[in-house]
Amino acid sequence: MADSGSDAPISNRPEEEVTVEKTPEMEAAAEEERLRYLEFVQQAAAQVLVLAAAAYAYAKQGAGPLRPGVDHVEGTVKAVVGPVYDRFHGVPLDLLKFLDRKVGESVQELDRRVPPVVKEAPGLARSAAAEVRQAGLVGTATGLAKSAIARAEPRARDLYTRYEPVAERKAAEAWAALNRLPLVPSVTRAVLPAAASLSARYNTAVADGAKRGSAVATYLPLVPTERLSRVFGYPLADAATSPAPEMQPIPSQ
């Protein structure tokens, strides 16, 4: 007679993984820790740390006769910086979280104060795209451009007049700070002449097309070479003997 013991049969199958469902409290905590607007800063900082550590290890390995001096400097830095780092190593993330929340508040405030016509822009763009598909590209695009400029030009001109000098000054300051980094000046000396030449050729082509009556060239903007030369500190003026003329205004119907 078979043994009728209550022992369950032994299975050789591995135990199934137990999936833990996240509770609303856990999801709320994770959302609180996640950076909504500045997460890319956190990721970029982590990537920079990894690359810097790898580069430092490689340089230290190839230091050769300078290795004892490198070790001495490294030990001194660790002795001085270590206690400070242990005390404040959590500050950057907290600071990022604080700034992230401030960005969120600014976005919400901007959304509240932005004119309704700006909020309607995506819908207007979809409507314009549908109209272009139905009625054809050239005539519709011309009409839409004239209508849009007639409505937006006064506001755009006012905003441009107020903010363009500030943006130009900030760009110049950022460019000056960037050029204090190693290798940047040598790279820009190699790149900017080519950019100046291409800008001059582009401006000349657009101006010639506008003189010949090209409808497309009428709507193409010119590269502001004089303004860029002030920002970059490099003569980006057009290579042509005479500067490119200003764009012709769109004729009104």
Swiss-Prot record:
It holds the Pfam family REF. Residues 13-26 have a biased composition (Basic and acidic residues). Residues 1-26 are annotated as: Disordered. Coiled coil: none annotated. It comes from the Eukaryota. Belongs to the REF/SRPP family. This is REF/SRPP-like protein Os05g0151300/LOC_Os05g05940.
